[in-house]
C-alpha cells in the first residue's frame, strides 16, 4: 500500500490549527509541548535535505502522542464543562488521533531523505554486515607497521 504524497507544510498546518484550538482549554505544558514540536517541523520544512530535522520532528510527534494522552486524561474532566471546553478537548483529541497517521507520513519523508531508524538489529551488539572499512583491531593488517621499513634497510622512526 502506497502512502499518499502529502506535503510536510499541510501536516504542520493541520496540527497547528488543531493545537491552537486545543489550547483554548488546555494550556501550559500542552501548548509548550505541541508548539515546540511544530517548531521542529518548521525547521524540517526550512532544511529540506536535513535528516536530523525530520528525525527530530518525527521523534517529537511520537513523544507528544504519549504526552497528549497523559495530559488529556488528567485534565479532561475539569476542562470539558462548557461548550468551548468540549470543543477544545475535541480538537485536542482529534489532533491526538491524527498524530499516528502523521507519524507514518513523516517517517516516509524521513526515509526519502536518507534517514534510518536508530533501533536496528545491531543496537544490542555488533553488526554482522561487512563494509569496505577495516576495523582497528583487524587481523588483516600487519602487527608492526614499521617492520616493512626495517626489512628494506630504511631507518624506522623512533617513538618517544
From Swiss-Prot:
Residues 128-160 are annotated as: Disordered. Residues 110-122 are annotated as: Interaction with AGTR1. It is a multi-pass membrane protein. Residues 1-9, 75-86 are extracellular. Residues 137-149 have a biased composition (Low complexity). Residues 31-53, 108-160 are cytoplasmic. It comes from the Eukaryota. The modification Phosphothreonine is found at residue 135. One of its GO terms (biological process) is regulation of blood pressure. Its main location: endoplasmic reticulum. It is found in: Endoplasmic reticulum membrane; Golgi apparatus membrane; Cytoplasmic vesicle membrane. The chain crosses the membrane at residues 10-30, 54-74, 87-107. It holds the Pfam family AGTRAP. Signal peptide: none annotated. Keywords: Cytoplasmic vesicle, Endoplasmic reticulum, Golgi apparatus, Membrane, Phosphoprotein, Transmembrane, Transmembrane helix. Appears to be a negative regulator of type-1 angiotensin II receptor-mediated signaling by regulating receptor internalization as well as mechanism of receptor desensitization such as phosphorylation. May play a role of negative regulator in cardiomyocyte hypertrophy induced by angiotensin II through an inhibition of p38 mitogen-activated protein kinase pathway. Attenuates type-1 angiotensin II receptor growth promoting effect and angiotensin II-induced phosphorylation of protein kinase AKT and of STAT3. This is Type-1 angiotensin II receptor-associated protein.
Amino acid at each position: 500500500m502506497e502512502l499518499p504524497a502529502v506535503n510536510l507544510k499541510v501536516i504542520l498546518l493541520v496540527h497547528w490549527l488543531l493545537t491552537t484550538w486545543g489550547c483554548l482549554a488546555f494550556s501550559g505544558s500542552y501548548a509548550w509541548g505541541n508548539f515546540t514540536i511544530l517548531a521542529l517541523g518548521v525547521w524540517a520544512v526550512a532544511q529540506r535535505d536535513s535528516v536530523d530535522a525530520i528525525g527530530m520532528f518525527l521523534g517529537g510527534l511520537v513523544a507528544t502522542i504519549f504526552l497528549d494522552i497523559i495530559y488529556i486524561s488528567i485534565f479532561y474532566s475539569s476542562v470539558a464543562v462548557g461548550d468551548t471546553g468540549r470543543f477544545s478537548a475535541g480538537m485536542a483529541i482529534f489532533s491526538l488521533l491524527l498524530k499516528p497517521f502523521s507519524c507514518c507520513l513523516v517517517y516516509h519523508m524521513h526515509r526519502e531523505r536518507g534517514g534510518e531508524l536508530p533501533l536496528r538489529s545491531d543496537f544490542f551488539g555488533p553488526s554482522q554486515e561487512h563494509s569496505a572499512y577495516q576495523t582497528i583491531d583487524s587481523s588483516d593488517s600487519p602487527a608492526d607497521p614499521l617492520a616493512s621499513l626495517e626489512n628494506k634497510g630504511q631507518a624506522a622512526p623512533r617513538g618517544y
